[in-house]
């Protein structure tokens, strides 16, 4: 009896394995195996593409007259998924399968590849061949399969190799060393041509959609021979940044340029997935943020605090979001906040609901708490936070330090080989700025602490590290900010304790981005430091109720 059961169990396991293998083969998608071209260009997983398409109204799938554009095509996944939905939605309009599919690919779906390579990949995905007009040449293998391949419709649906998926043909326009469209540098630090201008490089990443001052005319020439045609729906996943190869070491965001260019084309609908960093920060994104949060045409916004939920193999600081822009309908935006714990919080509000707030606050509860605190009318703690590199300290080397403090000499607090420590500087060390903070009490706080997390990622999050008292005659290295001037040591110690409260760190977390600036501390109130404040004192002072307190306590971690 036992042998029989074992045999049946073995047979069942075998059948299950076979079924799983068969299911994998049937549902296998080659696009899921393609890695990203680089950090700037992140391929869109099929599932994410489908979720973005789900934000569009149902009527778009049964309208044969709409023209769709992906201005930043990387692998054809958007056009393919759109084509599949249109093929189903247009069955009543055109029952003949071949005529229906020909109409969809010929008359409705268009894209511009980001590079030569991605254009070919996209055509291979959508047309089954990198040449849209390639016909079957009659050569087959022993099993009857075409050796050299051929395009959909046997290459007869298009007259050109590109079809409606165009290869970019633009270059950067450099004026005084910078591209006038995307801002990238013409030359590297060594004075030689950079990666975006080097004639020896095959790709210069001059993305066509954002490298033309009259994009409407350019698009009409490229796709419609100059005819006055327009696109009804624009959708895509633009490249996120261009690495700064010149004097700076950071990367310049460019996804905002794609969004703004798409809006200029005035489509009926527009949907894109981009980093969420624009909510509260990002290099050169202040004007973009102001326009976005005041735009009442953004009707749906999905915000992922953890980017890996959309892009498993990619780390994107601050998360990612996708949104729907609706030209003909203004109103409140439906916001879906996808937290790390799998919880999705929903709200419906104008993105600039609180006119005193100049950023997009991710969740409604944080906005509610901030409103209560702002009603008390306190000044901003950011008013006593220094700019970056408060004392103008450059590169430090051992020759600048001495073992013992010299008369009238100064000390420097920073992160050295042994971690945080204070060292004595040689007499005559020049402080180039922030002299008003040298001979007073102050507090030092790190300007960068990505590991401390953000509100909602993780839960709970630390937000900032431990602040340190800065004594009279002590400055700090460029990796710290200074808070002051303060009257005495007691006041400085009270500031350190205030900055350690969950109340303070929650308000900092609302604005926190990768790098901390004085602006990061804008929402924390500037209170009296004649006394030592604890969280309970602050909750009472600002009239926070039980729900407010529970929310803060849940999301902010105790400091060690």
Q: What is the predicted function of each stretch?
A:
Residues 35, 39, 47, 229, ...:
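C-terminal substrate-recognition regions of SAM-dependent nucleic acid methyltransferases
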Residues 1-301, 306-310, 319, 323-332:
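SAM-dependent methyltransferase catalytic region
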Residues 547, 552-560:
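Short, amphipathic C-terminal "tail helix"
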Residues 128-129, 502, 558-559:
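A short structural micro-motif
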Residues 191, 534, 555-558:
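Charged, elongated alpha-helical/coil segments that serve as electrostatic interaction surfaces
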Residues 52, 122, 495, 552-553:
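A structural signal for short hydrophobic/aromatic patches embedded in well-ordered alpha helices
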């Amino acid at each position: 009896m036992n042998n029989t059961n074992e045999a049946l169990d073995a047979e069942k396991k075998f059948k299950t394995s076979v079924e799983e293998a068969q299911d994998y083969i049937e549902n296998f998608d080659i696009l899921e195996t393609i890695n990203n071209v680089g950090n700037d260009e992140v391929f869109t997983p099929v599932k994410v593409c489908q979720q973005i398409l789900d934000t569009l109204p149902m009527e778009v799938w049964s309208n044969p007259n709409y023209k769709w554009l992906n201005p930043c095509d990387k692998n054809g996944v958007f056009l393919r998924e759109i084509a599949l939905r249109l093929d189903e939605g247009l069955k009543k309009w055109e029952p003949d399968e071949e005529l229906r599919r020909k109409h969809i690919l010929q008359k409705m779906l268009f894209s511009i590849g980001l590079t030569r390579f991605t254009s070919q990949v996209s055509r291979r995905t959508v047309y089954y061949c990198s040449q849209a007009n390639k016909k079957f040449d009659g050569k087959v293998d022993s099993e009857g399969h075409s050796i050299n391949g051929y395009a959909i419709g046997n290459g007869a649906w298009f007259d050109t190799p590109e079809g409606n998926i165009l290869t970019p043909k633009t270059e950067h326009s450099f004026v005084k060393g910078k591209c006038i469209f995307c801002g990238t540098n013409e030359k590297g630090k060594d004075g030689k041509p950079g990666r975006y201008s080097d004639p020896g490089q095959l790709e210069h990443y001059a993305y066509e959609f954002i490298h033309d001052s009259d994009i409407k005319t350019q698009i009409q020439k490229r796709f419609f021979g100059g005819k006055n045609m327009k696109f009804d729906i624009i959708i895509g996943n633009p490249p996120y940044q261009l690495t700064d190869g010149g004097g700076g070491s950071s990367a310049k965001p460019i996804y905002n340029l794609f969004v703004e260019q798409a809006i200029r084309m005035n489509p009926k609908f527009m949907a894109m997935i981009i980093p969420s960093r624009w909510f509260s920060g990002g290099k050169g994104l202040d004007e973009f943020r102001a326009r976005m949060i005041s735009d009442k045409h953004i009707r749906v916004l999905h915000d992922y605090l953890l980017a890996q939920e959309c892009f498993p193999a990619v780390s994107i600081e601050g998360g990612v979001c996708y949104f729907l822009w609706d030209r003909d309908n203004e109103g409140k935006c439906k916001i879906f906040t996808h937290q790390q714990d799998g919880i999705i919080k929903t709200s419906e509000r104008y993105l600039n609901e609180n006119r005193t707030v100049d950023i997009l606050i991710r969740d409604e509860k944080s906005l509610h708490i901030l409103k209560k605190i702002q009603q008390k009318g306190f000044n901003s703690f950011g008013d006593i936070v220094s700019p970056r590199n408060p004392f103008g300290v450059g590169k430090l080397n051992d020759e600048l330090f001495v073992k013992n403090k010299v008369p009238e000499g100064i000390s420097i607090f920073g992160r050295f080989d042994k971690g945080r420590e204070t060292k004595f500087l040689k007499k005559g060390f020049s402080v180039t700025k922030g002299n008003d903070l040298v001979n007073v009490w102050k507090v030092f706080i790190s300007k960068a602490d990505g590991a401390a997390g953000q509100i909602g990622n993780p839960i709970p999050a630390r937000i900032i590290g431990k602040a340190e008292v800065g004594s009279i005659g002590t400055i700090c290295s460029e990796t710290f900010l200074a808070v002051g001037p303060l009257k005495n040591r007691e006041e400085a110690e009270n500031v350190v304790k205030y900055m350690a409260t969950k109340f303070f760190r929650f308000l900092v977390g609302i604005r926190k981005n990768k790098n901390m600036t004085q602006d990061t501390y804008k929402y924390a109130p500037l209170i009296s430091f004649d006394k030592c404040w604890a969280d309970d004192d602050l909750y009472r002072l600002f009239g926070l109720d039980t729900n407010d307190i529970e929310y803060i306590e849940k999301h902010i971690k105790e400091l060690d």
